[in-house]
Amino acid sequence: MEANQSHNAKTNHPTCLTIAGSDCSGAAGIQADLKVMTAHQVYGMSVLTALTCQNSHGITGIYPLHPSLIQRQIDACLSDIQCRVVKIGMLPDPKSIPVISQALTKYKITDVVMDSVIISSMGNVMCETPTIPATIQHLFPHLLVYASNVMEAFILVEKTLKKSPPPLKSFPDIQNLMSIIHRLGPKFVVLRGHHVAFDKNMMITEKPDSKSWTADLIYDGKEFYIFEKPYNTTKSIHGESCSLTAAIASNLACNIPPLQAIHEALYSIEWAIQRVHKKSSDPYKSAQLFTALGHSSKFSGSLISLKSENYIPQADLTSVLLSHIPS
């Protein structure tokens, strides 16, 4: 039995390390990750990559930490407390990326979940341009799960190909985007469709109405899995993306298989979002999200019950999806 496994067996308690930036408002970054891990009864450790000055209105300052300090934090955590799951969030500059990659190899981390932090929900750029190719070169080979929204995924592919990918006009275009990312290394690619609305013909529409729909998608290199849902016109809640990837990592730390871990994390985040009052102020929405996530953890893991028609493989994508779209 490997050291990571023996540690978890000995303590009988799942552990997870998050490597990300600090959000002083508590709604995103390291602070969000640790809240979600606690809700899943996972022991969370943290390595700061940057200090940020931010809240629900925007970011006023990003201060990257020196790579040597990032390395010393990782060593302090993983030389003492063994774990096999690492979640990676904000990486503001490329200098720290080789350090993180070397640490993942040194400590034999098997389950790495990356949250694409290129642009914040408020539209702030969160990393230097050279960070993207450095991430693909050094970190993508380690990834079990890469999670992003459609907009950030498009930017990542654009920077990788050094040219704009085909324009996104339809559902199959989103699938093509995911398959390109999968070929870069991650075993599972997760795209949240919050920013994209589809009409009944599976075309992307810029004028969504009550019949518009969206979907969160998972691609494992063989099949696409679709979590179809009504399109929500409200903007993202500060901390949504961090919470999703922290939930995936927490589920993995609890020995839930990857596809199920992703599926249940998507469900718990969506469950929590539905319980946020739409007329609340932005800061209070984040607070409500984490409160709801604390309750949704009751339904996570093997206890969660999902409607099979909302989570389907791509056996007959068009006919199955159209059967669920209002006519």
From Swiss-Prot:
4-amino-5-hydroxymethyl-2-methylpyrimidine binds at residue 54. One of its GO terms (cellular component) is nucleus. This is Putative hydroxymethylpyrimidine/phosphomethylpyrimidine kinase C18B5.05c. Belongs to the ThiD family. It comes from the Eukaryota. Keywords: ATP-binding, Cytoplasm, Kinase, Nucleotide-binding, Nucleus, Thiamine biosynthesis, Transferase. GO terms for molecular function: ATP binding; hydroxymethylpyrimidine kinase activity; phosphomethylpyrimidine kinase activity. Pathway: Cofactor biosynthesis; thiamine diphosphate biosynthesis; 4-amino-2-methyl-5-diphosphomethylpyrimidine from 5-amino-1-(5-phospho-D-ribosyl)imidazole: step 2/3; Cofactor biosynthesis; thiamine diphosphate biosynthesis; 4-amino-2-methyl-5-diphosphomethylpyrimidine from 5-amino-1-(5-phospho-D-ribosyl)imidazole: step 3/3.
